[in-house]
Amino acid sequence: MSDIEKGKKIFVQKCAQCHTVDKGGKHKTGPNLHGLFGRKTGQAAGFSYTDANKNKGITWGEDTLMEYLENPKKYIPGTKMIFAGVKKKGERADLIDYLKKATNE
């Protein structure tokens, strides 16, 4: 069972320096993640993506995020995201549950 509060802590520690989740939130080094679930890679309006992100052509959901967040550069070679990933599956599940809630409010 995942834990949204743990997921929020992981987001604050590992993601928030580059991403926002609020509706209408600004892009930082990385795109605003509001509306992430069900969106195709490289599609946040107003953010400049690499061709690798635009051309990946997957839709973000629990399964794709689980794989991507383990090793972003392996999942999308050429991504600008300079993040090593979250290696522990339980932590990724917590983070994804937090993102599911936070990017949809």
Curated annotation (Swiss-Prot):
Report any one BP term from Gene Ontology. apoptotic process
The UniProt annotation places heme c binding at C15, C18, H19, M81
> Which positions carry N6-succinyllysine?
K56, K73
Q: Which SUPFAM superfamilies match?
A: Cytochrome c
Q: Does the keyword Metal-binding apply?
A: yes
InterPro entries assigned: Cyt_c-like_dom (IPR009056), Cyt_c-like_dom_sf (IPR036909), Cyt_c_1A/1B (IPR002327)
User: Which compartments is it annotated to reside in?
Assistant: Mitochondrion intermembrane space
Against Pfam families, the record matches this protein to:
Cytochrom_C
Instruction: Alphabetically list the UniProt keywords.
Output: Acetylation, Apoptosis, Electron transport, Heme, Iron, Metal-binding, Mitochondrion, Phosphoprotein, Respiratory chain, Transport
Q: Which domain of life is it from?
A: Eukaryota
Post-translational modification comment from the UniProt entry: Binds 1 heme c group covalently per subunit.
Q: Which GO terms describe its molecular function?
A: electron transfer activity; heme binding; metal ion binding
**What would be one Gene Ontology cellular-component term for the protein?**
mitochondrial intermembrane space
Identify residues that carry N6-acetyllysine: K73, K100
Q: Which residues carry this modification: Phosphotyrosine?
A: Y49, Y98
Entry function: Electron carrier protein. The oxidized form of the cytochrome c heme group can accept an electron from the heme group of the cytochrome c1 subunit of cytochrome reductase. Cytochrome c then transfers this electron to the cytochrome oxidase complex, the final protein carrier in the mitochondrial electron-transport chain.
Tell me its family: Belongs to the cytochrome c family.
**What is the protein's name according to its record?**
Cytochrome c
What organism is this sequence from? Otolemur garnettii
The gene name reads: CYCS
